[in-house]
């Protein structure tokens, strides 16, 4: 009986834990330092989570957000073409994008000549950065 109770407790804990990308959130926060030259993370209430540049869009809540949807940001044609397909950023898609943005656009925009405005490629640590970004979600509205 004790064994069953322990297994049931572990199952309940694992089911209640938030599901993030396969990466390491703490490592991703550190690696995000490479992204701050172009990107900031600013909460919906204006709280600055990561001070950074404005060359790229704010990355708060990016996981789960439709592509090219951050207000008033001037996206390139390639990412807008991919967005027209109704794509939503998920962990796997965002990881592939930050590893090689132009290759990702080539595969997902329908335009083999599409170029990304994001020239930086995150060769290592992409899953960690995406796990970090996925952990920064807007609060759910109260019922």
Feature roles, as predicted:
Residues 1-8:
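Bacterial N-terminal signal peptides that target proteins for export
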Residues 8-16:
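Bacterial N-terminal signal peptides
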Residues 56, 60, 91-99, 130, ...:
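An amphipathic alpha-helix signature
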Residues 120-124, 128-136:
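Short, exposed beta-strand-loop hairpins at the edges of beta-sheets
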């Amino acid at each position: 009986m004790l064994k069953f109770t322990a297994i049931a407790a572990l199952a309940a804990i694992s089911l209640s834990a938030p599901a993030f990308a396969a990466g390491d959130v703490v490592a991703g926060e550190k690696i995000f330092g490479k992204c701050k030259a172009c990107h900031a993370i600013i909460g919906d209430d204006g709280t600055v989570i990561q001070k950074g540049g404005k060359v790229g869009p704010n990355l708060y809540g990016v996981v789960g957000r439709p592509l090219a949807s951050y207000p008033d940001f001037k996206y390139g044609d390639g990412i807008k073409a991919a967005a027209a397909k109704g794509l939503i950023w998920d962990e796997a898609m965002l990881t592939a994008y930050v590893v090689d943005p132009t290759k990702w656009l080539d595969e997902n925009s329908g335009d083999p000549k599409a170029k990304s405005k994001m020239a930086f490629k995150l060769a290592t640590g992409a899953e960690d950065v995406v796990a970090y970004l996925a952990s920064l979600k807007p609060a759910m509205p109260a019922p």
